[in-house]
Amino acid sequence: MPTPHTQQAYDPEGNFTMRWTRADIRQIVAQSHTAGADKNSLPQALTMPDIPQDFPLINSNVWVWDTWPLADLRANQLSYKGWEVIFSLTADPHAGYTFDDRHVHARIGFFYRRAGIPASQRPANGGWTWGGHLFPDGASARVFGTAPMTNNAEWSGSARLTNGSNVSLYYTATSFNRSAPGGADITPPQAIITRADGHIHADDKHVWFSGFDDHKALLQPDGNYYQTGQQNTYFSFRDPFVFTDPAHPGKTYMVFEGNTGGQRGARTCTEADLGYAPNDPYKEDLNAVMNSGAVYQKANVGLAVATNPQLTEWKFLPPILSANCVDDQTERPQIYLKDGKYYLFTISHRTTMAAGVDGPDGVYGFVGNGIRSDFQPLNGGSGLVLGNPTDFSAPAGAPYSQDPNQNPREFQSYSHYVMPGGLVESFIDAIGPRRGGTLAPTVKVGINGTSTAVDRTYGRGGLGGYGDIPANLPATGAGHNDGNSQ
């Protein structure tokens, strides 16, 4: 049975961290079934609908993956002068590296399309026009000063429209210093949560940006709450999502992906991380769990608060969620308010989960009464919200080397982002042998208290338009600095 969680809210600047436990995550398999001919173990209500293998490309000259909208500080998605605008991690499919090597070459780019057109009336690929790279060449690399590097990449974050036309882009500046492309690290990779500001412009024909020349380093891992590259070459520190909380007016917060501070593989997992009741017949032995290698999986969701009104100075707070001996990646976290509740959504991979637990690539979610809560994992305590169809009896494989016994859509979508109204966008990774690098069809998830379900009446069989990322409010000038875009 899952660990009891109360949803109780705590002071955001307090030190309570909700533990996503092994007892919680093991509910995924407990609530699943033996896969039949469909090669899917998951309940249908939690399964991403099958994406056709003949999917269209958003743009044949750009690989696209993590994507986020132009938004305000309350995550309303804004149209600007009649245009919808999105930002994506992009790479060049013609540059000679493979799709799986794209991460060290990632640049943030943008796309735009006219607002207010139903998906059914748009081109099959969503109708987005490629606007180009957002930042001037080399601007991101300057935050690293004289540190040696062979590659600089721009990783995910969030875009906030403030004060009319100002766009603050919070993102992850990364650098790599390797002996050869794909080779060994000479020095550990670096990741710095960074902000750059520019201005959006639009006329009746297109959208463009100016600025983004100056990049300000905001946060680097401290080694205490959040693991550093010196502690673990495989550390995670990325994906800033910046927001305001109506319960704490005047404050601006950021959630991000981290790992628990300390040396990689340290035997620091506790009985509380396992989370079993004393009489649970499925209770595991702590030493056996740590001996299994689960000590290498220690994800967390971090929290920071701005300490000045300009949002250029930030301080770490303790993480709001830990997944010690459970999972190693809780990517692209976001806070989502609905019906007075605070939902924490994040994404993860089957291959980053600890030995002895299992779950699909997809979205995981938790609900509480504040941004720091004893979050209750959704859907029977497991946390699973939306997973790719997966056969738990077959090995995971990899997007570039799929197991023949596995569901061919195990890697069909990833990097999901939950939008207003329960819409969820993502990108296509691999469907059978065909690789993606383009936006997936949007789906809709009904969110009701502690449970969610895919709406299969949405679109066609549950699949909406490819890359359908609609604005829910127009940008109306003043007010974006506090998120009140009314």
Task: Label every model-predicted segment.
Residues M1-Q486:
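Carbohydrate-active catalytic/glycan-binding domains of CAZyme proteins
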